[in-house]
From Swiss-Prot:
SUPFAM superfamilies: Immunoglobulin, MHC antigen-recognition domain. InterPro entries: Ig-like_dom (IPR007110), Ig-like_dom_sf (IPR036179), Ig-like_fold (IPR013783), Ig_C1-set (IPR003597), MHC_class-I_related (IPR050208), MHC_I-like_Ag-recog (IPR011161), MHC_I-like_Ag-recog_sf (IPR037055), MHC_I/II-like_Ag-recog (IPR011162). Keywords: Cell membrane, Disulfide bond, Glycoprotein, GPI-anchor, Lipoprotein, Membrane, Signal. Residues 149-240 are annotated as: Alpha-2. Residues 57-148 are annotated as: Alpha-1. Its main location: membrane. Residues 242-333 form the Ig-like C1-type domain. This is MHC class I-like protein MILL1. Residues 332-352 are annotated as: Disordered. Residues 241-337 are annotated as: Alpha-3. Disulfide bonds join C158-C221, C260-C317. It comes from Mus musculus. It is a lipid-anchor; GPI-anchor. Heterodimer with B2M.
Length: 395
């Protein structure tokens, strides 16, 4: 017997919430060119009080992104409205409807922003909720769908590129499908996928006003991004200097593996170099695609090299990171072969222990989600496209 559409939609919402929670903990599941579903936009006029940031080259690109979701009906155990904010793909400041808690997952950002700035950021979440709910209510009413469960999603933000310029992005999605994308060059909305002229007109007339979207993408978002970036720079006082640690491990094949690990990296660019008699023999430069998050807003990296027993004292590891140039010798005392020097514990999901725990949690949640989908909806096929994960039902 086929189950009702509402029951199927409810199961889909559960799976989508699981994805959001996993992404909140582990980061995005796929890299993309900011091709995420995006939510509603402000309808009322916005008074611009932010000064447009100066164009200044940066060592690496930075991104500020907002992911919003609204449900057309209340579902027990699920938030009717959810907002996630990401700085360089790391979540902070989650907001859920029916919850009085709006706290930053990146405390250094909150600590170094002025109180009035942080309050304004929090108040904006309430406005975004009302705007998104209003848009969803209008869409479902026009289509005669106000008795069914539907989802309206939004993704928007901006990227600071290496040459100092910025570009914005804004997308809207309905029931897991992209339907509107804002073109920042032409200042127009385009309907994704094939559609009749009537449907195109319907969606475009309900999209956020182009002038307000332009103001947000050109002025407000870049200014917020610059503030967050400055906040993290100031946060270096809390994290201290980068830390370099060298460990070794003896293998029975007559070689020793030296591993150089760098912690407390405050940007996603670093270079680790193995030196023998102070001359480089192996070098690796880490960027946004290869460096690892530590889970506390900083990053870490490592590089290994194999040497003959007795050569440890010839080697040292060099870290170049921002204005820091740190050298760490490979051996300050005679190693005990066959043993492994104890490594200091690391905090956050970037550590090995953290990764194993989160891996176990991921497996459990996937099994639960799969079981739920089998019982309520039949098999589901998950897919990741352009950084946004969704699913297809296999009938």
């Amino acid at each position: 017997m086929l189950l009702s559409r509402n029951l199927r939609a409810l199961a889909a919402i559960h799976l989508w919430i699981v994805y959001l929670l996993l992404e909140d903990l582990l980061g995005t599941c796929a890299e993309g060119d900011n091709q995420r579903l995006v939510a509603s936009a402000p309808y009322q006029d916005i008074e611009i009080t932010l000064e447009k940031p100066r164009v200044q080259a940066v060592a690496e690109p930075h991104t500020l992104r907002y992911d919003l979701m609204a449900l057309s009906l209340e579902v027990p155990g699920l938030p009717q409205f959810l907002t996630l904010r990401y700085f360089d793909d790391e979540p902070f400041l989650p907001y859920k409807k029916n919850s009085s808690i709006t706290d930053s997952q990146e405390p250094r950002i909150k600590d170094h922003l002025r109180a009035e700035t942080w309050g304004r950021e929090t108040d904006d979440l309430q406005e975004e909720e009302e705007q998104l709910k209003g848009m969803l209510a209008e869409i479902t009413a026009q289509n005669g769908q106000n008795t069914d469960l539907h989802i309206l999603q939004a993704t928007f933000g901006c990227e600071l590129q290496r040459n100092g310029s910025t570009r914005g992005f804004w997308k809207l999605g309905y029931d897991g499908q992209n339907f509107l994308t804002f073109d920042q060059k032409t200042l127009t909305w385009t309907v994704d996928g094939p559609s009749t002229q009537k449907n195109k007109t319907f969606w475009k007339t309900r999209a956020p006003r182009a002038d307000l979207v332009k103001t947000f993408l050109d002025d407000i978002c870049p200014a917020q991004l610059q503030r967050y970036l400055a906040s993290l720079r100031n946060g270096l006082l809390n994290t201290g200097f980068p830390k370099v640690i060298v460990t070794f491990r003896n293998y029975p094949v007559g070689r020793i593996t030296l591993t150089c690990r760098a912690f407390r990296l405050y940007t996603r660019v670093a270079t680790l170099t193995w030196l023998q008699y102070r001359k480089p023999v192996q070098q690796k430069t880490f960027g946004s695609e290869t460096i690892l998050p530590s889970g506390d807003g900083t990053y870490q990296a490592w590089v290994s090299i194999r040497v003959l027993p007795g050569q440890e004292s010839q080697f040292s590891c060099n870290l170049k990171h921002g204005n820091h140039n740190i050298n760490e010798p490979a051996a300050t005392e005679a190693p005990v072969y066959g043993a492994r020097r104890e490594q200091p514990p690391t905090s956050g999901v970037g550590s090995r222990v953290g990764k194993s725990l989160w891996s176990a949690m991921t497996t459990a949640l996937v099994v639960i989600s799969w079981t739920l989908s089998q019982k309520l909806m039949g098999p589901l096929l998950w897919f990741c496209s352009g950084g946004f994960c969704s699913f297809l039902q296999c009938w």
